[in-house]
């Protein structure tokens, strides 16, 4: 389903559980050598998905190490994003001629634990979430907001190389259109010669998972 919220011309792969054929390169093994089995399984299958997507793109499908703040290190000439949560793993990759930066995030379609919304949402976002929960209760809008902010960060970091706090972007959802706009309160993002004050995102809630994406087109 991830292909429904990313641009045409990108390549994706996804899995709804850990795959027995998924393996890691020795360099990747070092990243999760101390991880619990659940985390290791998610990481391994997510890397497997990433290599599937890279192969479809015609790019080298070797080890994908982690760089600053855990961001995946893609082969030269590739931009992409990886996500994994309970019951879902996915990756998307693209060529820089099409996409400057992209972020995806998956979360279980469940309400956030008590207190988390207060920690991640601005006051007006909290009001909007409560209104959306009342009008469209089948979507866990609090969890969707959290996911969307993760996607915003994943698209922001490769451009700016610095952390973006949750309060650094204000999100506005279109519940009917499956889209959202992120207003960059922490300052604009610089994408080549462009100065971006907003990011555009897409979302869906399906099969017990909420998915979000943010794409900065080339």
Kindly give the residue locations of the regions a language model identified.
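Core catalytic alpha/beta fold that binds nucleotide/phospho-ligands
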Residues: 1-218
